[in-house]
Amino acid sequence: MKNPKMTVIGGGTGISIILKSLRNEAVDITAVVTVADDGGSSGELRNAMQLAPPGDLRNVLLAMSDMPKFYERVFQYRFNESDGALAGHPLGNLIIAGISEMQGSTYNAIQILTKFFHITGKIYPSSEQALTLHAVFKDGHEVAGESSIAKYPGMIDHVYVTNTYNDQKPQASRKVVEAILESDMIVLGPGSLFTSILPNLVIPEIKEALRQTKAEVVYICNIMTQYGETEQFSDADHVAVLNQHLGRDLIDTVLVNVAKVPQAYMNSNKFDEYLVQVDHDFAGLCRAAKRVISSYFLRLENGGAFHDGNLVVEELMNLVRIVKQ
């Protein structure tokens, strides 16, 4: 029997937790990564070189690689504030940017680095061009730019993307559409709902591919609410927003953590974008999705509350075996 095909969609921080564990399973992995980041080092390089931002892709490359820890530290090394124009840039971002310039696109750079790091899965930016994320708030106000959205004091109604450097309609990478249509399972998240997951899904070709695919669509719900994005959200609210943007109820299965996060891990100065634990609305989830898997997926580490990648992947593998029957 062929290995199941699984496509994981999101941002570099959230889905890396899942990919680190998933890479050890007998599964054909494709990671689809957002290109809407406009903050920090990624934003600076994107603006200076008009390329797709490298930061999220860098994190996914490392998550899917089994390179020695020292090489990983080298790739993640961030230059000091005293280092002039290099200040704040991770070395890996500069490497991706350099190869992108040599090879004509970030897409090409990632394919080269995937081979260089002997990664067996596939990694694709959701679009081959940098995209700008726009958020329309319920009061009618609109904010452009991922890094600016959370700063506006309002509730987001919906988001959309535009090409950053031309007026053409945003287009998905062709390989991304193929992966979605050929997958047995699509995994969304975990990660920032409006600024990491949805920037991929609102690209027209990706939205349409998700409508057409026969794959099981799984959403890994966030454990904590996020400042400026999902304040006071329940888990069912997260799913409702996804279905709203996809234009129909496409989420088949939701994975939800039900382990309690200790109070000491909330409103942490170290992770100040996260607020409180997401409320569990089981009845709402059952209305929004076909299947709900509630379990203890929590991992407490370095003062933060995260998903336990091994436990999540165990459930994903059990589920994909069922849907392939």
From Swiss-Prot:
GO biological process, one term: regulation of cell shape
Keyword Cytoplasm listed: yes
Natural source organism: Streptococcus pyogenes serotype M1
GO molecular function, one term: LPPG:FO 2-phospho-L-lactate transferase activity
Family from the record: Belongs to the gluconeogenesis factor family.
Keywords, alphabetical: Cytoplasm
Subcellular location as annotated: Cytoplasm
NCBIfam families: CofD_related (TIGR01826)
Function: Required for morphogenesis under gluconeogenic growth conditions.
Protein name according to UniProt: Putative gluconeogenesis factor
Domain of life, per lineage: Bacteria
Short name of any one Pfam family annotated for the protein: CofD
The keyword Cytoplasm appears for this protein: yes
GO cellular component: cytoplasm
SUPFAM superfamilies for this protein: CofD-like
HAMAP family cross-referenced by the UniProt entry: Gluconeogen_factor
